């Protein structure tokens, strides 16, 4: 495998294909912020603004400005999105709405804590790019709200009946693992950060990870006991593999080889569990008992699942030299470039059916924005350059 040639392929796809698409097609220069709902050619098909995706796009361009090149157009793109978030995206208490209209009127209440996590990452990254104390303060206030809400993330918008079947989700500790490293540079109290990381790692490895299955469960009872219901049996292989490369980064930060080795061991188990042996690609959802799924999209092949898994595998290989990781990376690389890449228009498809045929031609929507494709290309490019 020619790592240098591959690195150039990922770099070129990011800088020459994907980023120009979002810069040109997504910016709303009239009202601020970004259009997320972009058809195959980049034409806008819906003007609502989803705060997860607004925050992610600010983060993306600020991160690239900080890490790749001091390009003014990247910084300008991030700043105009952040100004929209600052003015329109939260309730004054730094709880961020799920969605707003094109001109910034709230549509969906701030029930979803992930709007906060991506806003926090955005303002923290932009504070680093600009030196702005205001952006730093917004990031810190938002981070505090995430910690305040962590045990009851939906608060008054929680629809499950209290006490009958208490359950907690894997997504939050997984995102906080990543966010911890994102906000490290703006936190005064590093011990609080270490405590937060300890809690998240412990929760993932001791509560959500079940060695008898070799995977993380997506929802468990508060003490980690599996629950035999639709939600309790659910596995999201892409989530697991994304979390595992976040945790490898924490292993690097802590110089913890045992943690990195454990992550690689679990990752190889998860990808084997999640891989479609008949058609190739990774299933979106699976049931731990192989029972029928409640989610009709369970067998679809999604862009982010494969990109995050590819990052996990090439990072596992980089850190441990495990040849199985490299074999899986090759498999994922071939699958992604032959199925998700659009040969005619920029950016990548997001949604394929089980057989790997394009299900939706959109390049951005309610859940797909300027995030997993560019972040994945960037991460893989950077890792390949070290090999």
PLM regions and their residue ranges:
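Glycan-recognition and catalytic cores of secretory/periplasmic carbohydrate-active enzymes
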Residues: 1-387
């Amino acid at each position: 495998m020619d790592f240098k040639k591959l690195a150039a392929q990922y770099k070129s796809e990011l800088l020459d294909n994907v980023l120009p698409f979002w810069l040109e097609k997504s910016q709303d220069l009239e009202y601020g912020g970004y259009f997320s709902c972009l058809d195959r050619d980049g034409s806008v098909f819906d003007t609502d603004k989803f705060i997860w995706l607004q925050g992610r796009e600010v983060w993306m361009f600020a991160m690239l400005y900080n890490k790749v090149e001091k390009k003014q157009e990247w910084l300008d793109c991030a700043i105009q999105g952040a100004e929209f978030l600052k003015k329109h995206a939260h309730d004054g208490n730094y709880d961020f709405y799920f969605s707003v209209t094109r001109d910034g009127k709230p549509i969906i209440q701030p029930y979803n804590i992930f709007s906060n996590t991506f806003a926090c990452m955005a303002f923290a990254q932009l504070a680093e790019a600009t030196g702005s104390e205001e952006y730093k303060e917004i990031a810190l206030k938002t981070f505090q709200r995430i910690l305040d809400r962590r045990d009851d993330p939906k608060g008054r918008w929680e629809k499950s009946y209290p006490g009958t079947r208490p359950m907690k989700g894997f997504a939050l500790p997984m995102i906080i693992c990543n966010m911890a490293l994102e906000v490290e540079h703006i936190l005064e109290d590093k011990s609080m950060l270490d405590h937060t990381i300890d809690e998240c790692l412990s929760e993932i490895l001791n509560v959500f990870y079940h060695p008898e299955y070799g995977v993380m469960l997506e929802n468990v009872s508060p003490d980690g006991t599996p629950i035999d219901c639709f939600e309790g049996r659910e596995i999201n292989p892409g989530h697991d593999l994304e979390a595992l490369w976040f945790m490898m980064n924490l292993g690097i930060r802590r110089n913890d080889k045992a943690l990195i080795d454990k992550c690689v061991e679990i990752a190889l188990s998860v990808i084997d569990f999640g891989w479609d042996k008949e058609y190739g690609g990774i299933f979106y959802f699976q049931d731990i008992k192989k029972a029928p799924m409640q989610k009709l999209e369970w067998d679809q092949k999604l862009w982010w699942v494969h990109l995050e898994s590819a990052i996990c595998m090439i990072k596992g290989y980089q850190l441990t030299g495990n040849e199985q990781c490299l074999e899986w990376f090759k498999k994922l690389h071939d699958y992604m470039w032959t199925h998700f890449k659009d040969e005619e228009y920029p950016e990548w498809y997001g949604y394929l059916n089980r057989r790997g045929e394009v299900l939706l031609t959109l390049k951005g929507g309610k859940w797909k924005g300027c995030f997993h494709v560019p972040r994945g290309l960037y991460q893989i490019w950077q890792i390949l350059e070290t090999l």
